[in-house]
Amino acid sequence: MITTKRLFLIPWHASDADELYELAKDLEIGPLCGWEPHKTLEDSKQVLAKVLSEKFCYAVKDMKTGHVIGSMSLKFEEIPDSKDSSKQLYQAEIGYWIGRPYWGQGLAPEGAQALTAYAFEEHGVDQVIIRYLERNKKSASVARKCGFTEMGIITDFNKYTGKEEQFGISVLTKADWERAQK
């Protein structure tokens, strides 16, 4: 479990399906994150079983109420070092969404900062990236608030929609993160 001042991030559980559905059926959330809104409780149960059950996928819960307010995840990979092709970088990618009733309270940056620290401190990554649909201005804002640098826009295949889409990429290196901690 990862904790912040107001949140705890814990692995998803099948018993979270009802709360997931209530948030994920919102027409404003899924499309901004690149996935279809959940149409039924069964959709949420399937997403829990097939997607959110993966390691490093977390239910974001309000510390006071224990209610699910969103989702965050980490994916780890090795990539070629753009400065030295003989080396590999170990990076983490953060994904997140927060339910609309909880927007505007700084909860996404709070959770993303905790995941960033976890990736650097516990997994020793060289950098953390946030990749978001270019039209999702709120996600770009979260990245900026967390100290990430916007690297640009790429066109990539969105596996959820089956279409090519524009994605913004923001990066925070370990060195920049360490400087910001002082």
Residue spans for each PLM region:
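Short loop/turn motifs at secondary-structure junctions and domain boundaries
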Residues: 49-54, 148
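Conserved GNAT-fold acetyl-CoA-binding loop/helix
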Residues: 28-49
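Short linear motifs in intrinsically disordered
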Residues: 14-15, 48-50
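Acyl-donor (CoA/ACP) binding surface of acyl/acetyltransferases
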Residues: 1-28, 57, 61-182
